[in-house]
Regions:
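Acidic/proline-rich low-complexity IDRs
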Residues: 9-13, 19, 51, 87-88, ...
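Aliphatic-rich helix starts adjacent to a transmembrane/signal segment
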Residues: 21, 28-47
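N-terminal single-pass transmembrane signal-anchor helix
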Residues: 1-31
Length: 143
């Protein structure tokens, strides 16, 4: 009796499924890295806007705006981000959930300089910007 075997064996199908799984995993990792980088760049852009807002605030009020009135670092949260939007960014909605970062501002011991801190919501990445607009990562391995 002559039987024609058409189709794929179970092993061939398993190999194809395994290859598709590997490709999907690589794609998901690349995509989430892309999204993370985009959010970090958005935070950097908003920090530059805050710096411009600080310049305008200084020219109008004779001092910088601080979400943390004491010297030392601040802890970014929703309240500090909303306060920055109200006082420095013209009530814009620049610091939103899609950006994935919260911001705050604090002063140094001389009260003549400011720093902007951006912290990733639910993450470890912390960006720091000084009054000259230089942005650095607090711990590069976390970003």
């Amino acid at each position: 009796m002559n039987t024609n075997k058409l189709g794929f064996s179970l092993i061939e199908l398993l190999v194809v499924v395994a290859i598709l799984g590997i490709i999907a995993t690589l794609g998901i990792n690349a995509y989430s890295g892309y999204i993370s980088g985009t959010k970090k760049q958005s935070a950097r852009n908003v920090m530059q806007q805050v710096s411009l807002g600080q310049s305008e605030y200084m020219s109008q009020n004779g001092q910088y705006y601080y979400t943390n009135q004491s010297t030392g670092e601040c802890s970014p949260n929703t309240n500090s981000s909303n306060s920055i939007e109200q006082n420095l960014l013209g009530r814009s909605d620049s610091i939103n959930e899609e950006m994935g970062y919260e911001l705050c501002t604090h002063q140094d011991n001389t009260k003549t300089k400011f720093k902007v801190v951006a912290k990733e919501v639910g993450g470890k990445c912390i960006l720091l910007m000084n009054e000259f607009g230089a942005i650095s990562e607090k711990k590069a391995s976390d970003c």
